[in-house]
Amino acid sequence: MKKLYSIVGMWIVSAFCLLSAQSRVYSSVENVHSHNDYLQNVPFYTAYSARCASIEADVFLVDGELYVAHKENEINKARKLRNLYLNPIREQFEMNGGSGYPNGKSFQLLIDLKTDYKETMKVLEQQLLEYRDCFDVKKNPLAVRVVVSGFLPSPEEFSNYADFIFFDGRPRFIYTPEQSLRIPMMSTSFRTLTQWNGLGRMVETDYNMVKAFID
């Protein structure tokens, strides 16, 4: 079943939908997406305690390390992807006996690359491989699914990366059946579909465009 994520703490600027080919068991809390989660007073744990279905971290590669920040000039060397997300996820995963959330539910970690993918993906893949048990949904459907967004490799390059790493799709591409297996969600600018500002009702033509994209 396709679902549209709600975006927490900001205007909706992107439309996210889950493809039916990649059905998962998610939290029952309205499938909320924690956008720019690292800006929370307590990153990861605030969204985790609310049982968000998707948690987002923007990532920069600097001197061979991955840092979580909104802008490059906001990078804090203490705020590494490993510290803020990978280690806490592993801790909770092990406490839950091999599940993202207790009671047989899970979530996705959306990693938005803010630096060129060629070098950033190398380091990201190396780090994720250290936590493979937590993220390999092919071996364990209750593991945490990793989806990479932002500066993405081309669809032809998807197969160069570990098969438990997924990618955020773009409607401008026509994916092969094999590439589509790596695409659990699609994103586009909300403004490409409608100019609705959130006030009043969306006009019917815009509503139909948004609905068609989700469907």
Annotate the PLM regions:
Residues M1-S27:
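Bacterial Sec-dependent N-terminal signal peptides
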Residues A21-D215:
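Phosphate-group recognition and catalysis centered on beta-loop-alpha active-site segments
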